[in-house]
């Protein structure tokens, strides 16, 4: 008869034997990325879990952990800081931290880890989580929490964190309480592997892991290690590096392809696309596709095409101007529309597309609905290069594309001559000059509202290969500066184009400038209020409009920058501005303020666009 004592003894023998077996297997494993798991990391159960978590994430290709201060997250924070493979960035405000991570992940296409304590700190991640979700940006949100016995009992700094982000995350997992046993350590490792995979593949986006920790949270400096380092080494061994993934080749429906190829008067519309395969490869694929189909390419500014204009003779960028001219519309009416990615920002283009009696095709590599016009459209799931290769057999003439190019050329000449002649400071000319004077390859982040719209109107096509990003997932001004800082971190000198309200809305991110490893130049167009509202009918409501919509703040930006130790320049003329952007600093943050009048900006914009 098996007594309780016998059972316990047998169980302990089994677990000891299993541990010995794992140590033996470890000797057969060669891992060039092995970590030491020092005594401090093995001094208590929470330290073990924190150390293993960060080591596994590092071996999966994660490079950066963005930490906000707090007590409950101590095991994760210390492990991130002590792991030599990881960079731990400390940002006080969780909202800024979240957007910093989004900006970095947008640029690198690798998941960035967020770590925060329990309570309201978690809630401050939500705007960034939403943006990451809607833009397909990989993010790993690790939140610390109280254990079950301290929940729902008025314990301090405790809220319901379970599935707090709702459907905005690709996956949620409530982690088990830390335990130093081989089965639980294996569970921890594989949960992390799944989380990284889930953040990257299929429909990339944020994943939330909630870590409950009991006291003691900090490692015990004088304690003996509670687990052998060899066991942890084995449990940290992973067989894949999901961050190093390749482009997905998806089979396309042959009937749909035949329908697509049968049209000789089609257009390709390319909106916001952040291609994982690389900017140049994406531009080459779209150029090949346009050449084989004989269709023009209407390109938003939020994809690589305008920066690689020599790759395509079919590129059309100024559609927002010439589609306002009634005499142009009939001759340009397509019979087919191929949309790649999201729709461009332009309301004029959206309205025109919605009025067309054309067959529509939607190409996307994410399982999301990208058609707010609700057309009867054929979905094509895959990447641009796969579709281009499927059309390699086609031979078409360029007459249809040439007609679009002729209209584009006349529009470009008109817009360029008008902008060149404008002596007074005008927000639209700021974007135009940036596109012509920034150093080759300069990453650019565009704030929402008018900054991204002026760039769509006036950003010139060329070969400067400037990667351009914006938070067009949720389209908010939240986290504008924080995202730009993340995008610039450990990258090339970067430029942010923003208005005054978007900048002020996230001015708390100036606290994070000391963590920046790199350079960010902020081009701040100060028109003392929300210029986008000037284009709405409510703008005629006088004081009500000014107080509740335009909301002028009258902030002295030189003083604000001085308070945070940020370099400030006032560009009073176009010569001042061009001189400032021709050479970007190698490190630090610099703000270039350009003061304009928002009501005059509106009138000037209407004049430029109406003249074509």
Regions found by a protein language model. Give the residues of each.
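A short, small-residue-rich loop immediately preceding and capping a beta-strand
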Residues: 63-67, 87-89, 107-146, 333-341, ...
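Glycine-rich, acidic loop regions that bind phosphate or pyrophosphate groups
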Residues: 143-195, 300-408, 537
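Glycine-rich, anion-gripping cofactor-binding loops and their flanking helix/strand elements
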Residues: 124, 254, 270-361, 369-372, ...
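Thiamine diphosphate
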Residues: 142, 149-163, 457-612
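Phosphate/pyrophosphate-binding active-site segments
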Residues: 31-44, 352-452, 559, 572-612
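Glycine/aspartate-rich loop-and-adjacent alpha/beta segment that forms the canonical ThDP
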Residues: 163, 204-206, 210-249, 580-612
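Active-site diphosphate/adenylate-binding microenvironment
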Residues: 50-53, 68-72, 76-77, 407-491
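N-terminal cofactor/phosphate-binding cores enriched in small/glycine residues
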Residues: 44-131
């Amino acid at each position: 008869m098996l007594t309780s004592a016998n059972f316990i003894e047998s169980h302990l023998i089994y677990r000891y034997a299993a541990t010995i077996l794992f140590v033996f297997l470890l000797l057969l494993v060669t891992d060039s990325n092995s970590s030491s798991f020092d005594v401090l990391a093995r001094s208590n159960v929470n330290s073990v879990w924190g150390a293993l978590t960060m080591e596994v994430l590092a071996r999966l290709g994660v490079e950066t952990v963005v930490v906000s201060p707090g007590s409950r997250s101590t095991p994760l924070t210390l492990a991130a800081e002590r792991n030599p493979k990881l960079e731990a960035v400390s940002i006080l405000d969780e909202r800024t931290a979240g957007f910093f991570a989004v900006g970095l992940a947008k640029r690198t296409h690798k998941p960035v880890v967020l770590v925060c304590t329990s309570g309201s700190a978690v809630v401050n991640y939500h705007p960034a989580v939403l943006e990451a979700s809607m833009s397909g940006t990989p993010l790993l949100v690790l939140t610390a929490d109280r254990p079950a016995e301290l929940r729902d009992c008025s314990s301090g700094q405790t809220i319901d964190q379970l599935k707090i982000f709702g459907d905005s995350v690709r996956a949620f997992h409530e982690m088990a309480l830390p335990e130093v046993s081989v089965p639980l350590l294996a569970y921890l490792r594989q949960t992390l592997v799944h989380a990284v995979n889930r953040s990257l593949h299929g429909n990339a986006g944020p994943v939330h892991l909630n870590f409950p920790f009991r006291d003691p949270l900090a490692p015990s400096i004088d304690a003996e290690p509670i687990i052998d380092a060899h066991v942890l080494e084995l449990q940290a061994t992973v067989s894949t590096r999901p961050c190093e993934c390749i482009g997905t080749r998806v089979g396309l429906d042959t009937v749909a392809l035949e329908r697509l190829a049968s049209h000789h008067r089609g257009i390709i519309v390319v909106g916001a696309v952040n291609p994982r395969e690389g900017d140049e490869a994406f531009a080459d694929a779209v150029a090949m596709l346009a050449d084989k189909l004989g269709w023009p390419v209407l390109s938003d500014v939020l994809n690589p095409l305008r920066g690689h204009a020599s790759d395509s003779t079919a590129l059309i960028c100024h559609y927002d101007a010439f589609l306002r001219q009634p005499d142009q519309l009939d001759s340009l009416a397509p019979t087919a529309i191929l949309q790649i990615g999201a729709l461009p920002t332009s309301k004029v283009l959206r309205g025109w597309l919605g009025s067309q009696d054309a067959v529509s095709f939607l190409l996307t590599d994410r399982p999301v609905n990208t058609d707010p016009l609700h057309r009867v459209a054929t979905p094509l799931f895959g990447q641009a290069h796969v579709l281009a290769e499927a059309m390699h057999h086609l031979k078409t003439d360029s007459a249809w594309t040439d007609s679009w190019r002729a209209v584009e050329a006349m529009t470009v000449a008109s817009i360029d001559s008008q902008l060149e002649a404008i002596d007074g400071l005008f927000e639209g000319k700021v974007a135009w000059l940036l596109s012509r004077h920034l150093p080759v390859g300069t990453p650019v982040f565009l704030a929402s509202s008018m900054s991204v719209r002026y760039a769509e109107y006036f950003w010139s096509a060329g070969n400067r290969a400037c990667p351009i990003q914006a938070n067009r997932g949720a389209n908010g001004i939240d986290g504008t500066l924080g995202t730009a800082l993340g995008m610039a971190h450990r990258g090339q000198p970067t430029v942010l184009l923003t208005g005054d309200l978007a900048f002020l809305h996230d001015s708390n991110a100036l606290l994070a400038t000391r963590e920046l490893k790199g350079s960010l130049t902020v081009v701040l167009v100060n028109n003392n209020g929300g210029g986008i509202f000037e284009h709405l009918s409510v703008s005629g409501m006088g004081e009500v409009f000014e107080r509740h919509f335009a909301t002028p703040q009258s902030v002295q930006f030189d003083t604000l920058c001085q308070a945070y130790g940020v370099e400030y320049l006032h560009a009073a003329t176009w010569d001042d501005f061009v001189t400032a952007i021709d050479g970007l600093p190698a490190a630090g943050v610099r703000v270039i303020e350009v003061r304009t009048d928002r009501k005059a900006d509106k009138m000037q914009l209407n004049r430029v666009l109406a003249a074509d």
